[in-house]
Amino acid sequence: MILLADIGATNARFCVTSDCYNYEHSESLEVIDSSSVEELCDKYLKRYELTNRVSKAVIGVAAPIIKDEVSFVNANISFSIEGLKNQLFQEGLIVVNDLALQAHAIKGLEKSELSFIGISKGQPEEGPKILVSPGTGLGLAGIVDQQIVATEAGHLNIPQKEIKNDLKKISDSFISKSKRAPTYEDFLSGKGVRFFYKVLSEDEGTNLSSKEILENKDLNEDCSKTKELIVYLLASYLRYVALVWGSTGGVYLAGSIVNTLITEEVYQTFRETFESSETMQDLLKAIPLILVTIDDIGFRGALELSKKL
């Protein structure tokens, strides 16, 4: 059997596969409850009495991979790939960036698992694609000629052109607290949603989660404004990265935040913001924006990679 894992900064999701086409025993563990990736994997394997049955693994991590070392950006854990292989997965181990893991699932998705955002003049082609997913952080992976490219594009600074009106108030507050300019990941993430709400509501002690804030837009004016600003900023971010990648094959969005944030009522304004360019509007109009509606894209990508073990 092969262990499949999608390890973020907040949650680690596990399952196993016997045939590389289906998975079972899915489980989510909180990263904060363990001191290492080895402990997380071992805890899952023991829970399902799989320790002696699993000797291979495919693991996606919310971290850059620099040679043998993996250090998470938004969680206090790190590990050696070779060390993890020697300890638990001696017959084979693949470790990739978590968005790269998810990107391996894109080619196999059914139309029923996708929702097109607004009306574009194009349909997905064989051109470059990108997959973007806001979560604890902000991930982006490229897909070029079926090759997956991991990036850390969430750490780009936000251009001053985009920081105006209420966004300037929020940016100034962030700079005051953090003593640095905000990156897209600072704002287009769960922590960003909560920060927006705290600044707008002037309620530093709020216990609302990012999901509750985005879902309460009809009941709370500050929730509504938070959603409006995040929608705008995400669409403008996608405009920049789509132009950099020349992603005529489509911009794919995945994860619980975007599926809560981008509802049909904002499809058209989201598309209009994405297409807002004085020089490249025709190209942007031809790029499909596609929402991935499934919640197991990490496992689906891991299944594809498991075929290589």
Give, region by region, the residue ranges found by the protein language model.
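Short glycine-aspartate micro-motif
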Residues: I2-D6, V54-V58, I94, K129-S133, ...
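ATP-binding/phosphotransfer module of carbohydrate and carboxylate kinases, centering on a glycine-rich
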Residues: M1-E49, K169-L309
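ATP-dependent carbohydrate kinase catalytic cores
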Residues: L93-P124, K217-S224, E228
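Glycine-rich phosphate-binding loop of actin/hexokinase-like ATP-binding domains
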Residues: P124-T183, F270-E275, T279, L284
